[in-house]
């Protein structure tokens, strides 16, 4: 959570830049938060905003940033979301992009991990057969991630052509060369693979942001 809070100044600067031209009757800037649990979750000490299945915390980084910037926030981030959930309806949740408006000023995007089996990757930190069982599938998913992310950006720009877009990456589950009693049963080669997988996801997220005129912030 502390790392996500360091993201707030970047949002503030971006919003100031996006709203540099004063209107005749100033209106609060419109900020839309899209993404997965990295954007939805915060501490567990406050009640959740509905729907509770999204685990959308009242002290998530979008909520804190919106208060800091005095912005009108539409927060549709949801735990477990993938690029498919951003672009299309999934059960009780409408497509996240439906929250975008033509006059949206700022969009934060925290997405991509679940397209590459991020939950399975978290299990790999304590699973000594993870790479053998899931490695090939996760590799294919990471390779396909740029295409999926480009589709998301295409839709964001179509719906909110003047919005500034900030993209976030994912914190490492295991650092290269790291060892501790909790993970010592995992072969060194598997630990390196896990660290590299998160690096590849972040690389895909960063490069997609650069291709599509967004700003990447880890």
Task: Report each predicted region and the residues it spans.
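Bacterial signal peptide processing site
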Residues: 20-22
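Structural recognition of the beta-strand scaffold that forms the well-ordered cores
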Residues: 30-35, 39-40, 72-77, 105-110, ...
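Serine-esterase "nucleophile elbow" of acetyl-processing enzymes
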Residues: 24-77
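C-terminal motif of bacterial Sec signal peptides marking the signal peptidase cleavage site
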Residues: 16-18
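Oxyanion-hole/transition-state-stabilizing segment in secreted/luminal serine hydrolases
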Residues: 85, 92-141, 172
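A structural motif corresponding to the C-terminal end of an alpha-helix
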Residues: 65-72, 148-166, 200-218
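Substrate-gating cap/lid alpha-helix
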Residues: 175-218
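Sec-dependent signal peptide recognition
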Residues: 5-10
